[in-house]
Every structure is written in structure tokens, then in C-alpha cells.
Amino acid sequence: MGKIALQLKATLENVTNLRPVGEDFRWYLKMKCGNCGEISEKWQYIRLMDSVALKGGRGSASMVQKCKLCARENSIDILSSTIKAYNAEDNEKFKTIVEFECRGLEPVDFQPQAGFAADGVESGTVFSDINLQEKDWTDYDEKAQESVGIFEVTHQFVKC
């Protein structure tokens, strides 16, 4: 199946460097089995800190699971070197923020939640634990004395 990139698009107001924080950041995804096409009903998360051994000593992945329909063992791995921030200059454009190595599992939907951080453009103030589940976030930058926000968060998956 190969590599699949998650691209984010958002409107940033007075913030930049929107990024996932830490190896325990949870990427909430819905997955499709590459063998039978079954799509998971529930959101599943994968984290950089999780590593599961593949059968037959073929390395490891962030998630290994057996398809409920066809019983095939599939895996997906977060490629840590591909994690990128979404910056002010990326405003309202799709930008790859992470890539996944997919072996039988294909991400088909993404739900941003808590664990993001961003910096004030003028002040450098760090806004931590940003939750994007509602696709919008607002706050106030005391140092710069201006409102800050992230709006209209959307995503797409593209094959690399």
C-alpha cells in the first residue's frame, strides 16, 4: 500500500507553528482494510510511542490489527521524521503534517482532538493543549493584546 500523507488545511489568526505535541499525541483515525475494504466503525488512535512487533520478525509498527471481516493482519506506522508544523504561511492551503507507512491498513478519516500547540505570531506566546475536535479554537494573547484562533480545520489523505 505504501505511504499515505495526512494533509491539514486551516485558517490561522495570529498564530503559527500549529503542531502535535509529544510521542503520546493521539492520531485519531478510521481505517480501511486493504484486502476486503472493511472500514472501522469506531475511531482508533495511534501514537508514536507505541510499537508493536510484526509477525515473523519483520520489524514493528505503531498499530497491528487483525481485520474483523477477513482476519488478515494489517499494520500502520507513523513516520516520525515526517511530522511537520502548520505555519502562518500555510494559511488556507493543504500541507502534509505527517506520513504513515501503510501495510494493509489505509486511513480514510481523521479527527483532530486535544494535544496540539501553537505560537503567537507577534508575541511567541505558546498556546498548549489546543483541542481541535470542534474544528475551531479561540483564545486571547495577553502579550500581543489580540485574539488568536484556528478556524475551518479540514484534512485530506494523499498517496506519497
From Swiss-Prot:
Pfam families in UniProt: CXXC_Zn-b_euk
Keyword list, A-Z: Metal-binding, Phosphoprotein, Zinc
InterPro entries, A to Z: CXXC_Zn-binding_euk (IPR008584)
Residues annotated as binding Zn(2+): 33, 36, 67, 70
Coiled-coil ranges from the UniProt annotation: none
Modified residues (Phosphoserine): 75
Protein's UniProt keywords contain Phosphoprotein: yes
Gene Ontology molecular-function annotations: zinc ion binding
Keyword Plastid among record annotations: no
Domain observations: The N-terminal and the C-terminal half of the protein have a very similar 3D-structure, suggesting they arose from duplication. Requires a bound zinc ion for normal folding and solubility.
Similarity comment: Belongs to the UPF0587 family.
Subunit structure comment from the entry: Monomer.
Entry protein name: CXXC motif containing zinc binding protein
Annotated organism of origin: Mus musculus (Mouse)
Lineage start: Eukaryota, Metazoa, Chordata, Craniata, Vertebrata
Encoding gene, per UniProt annotation: Czib
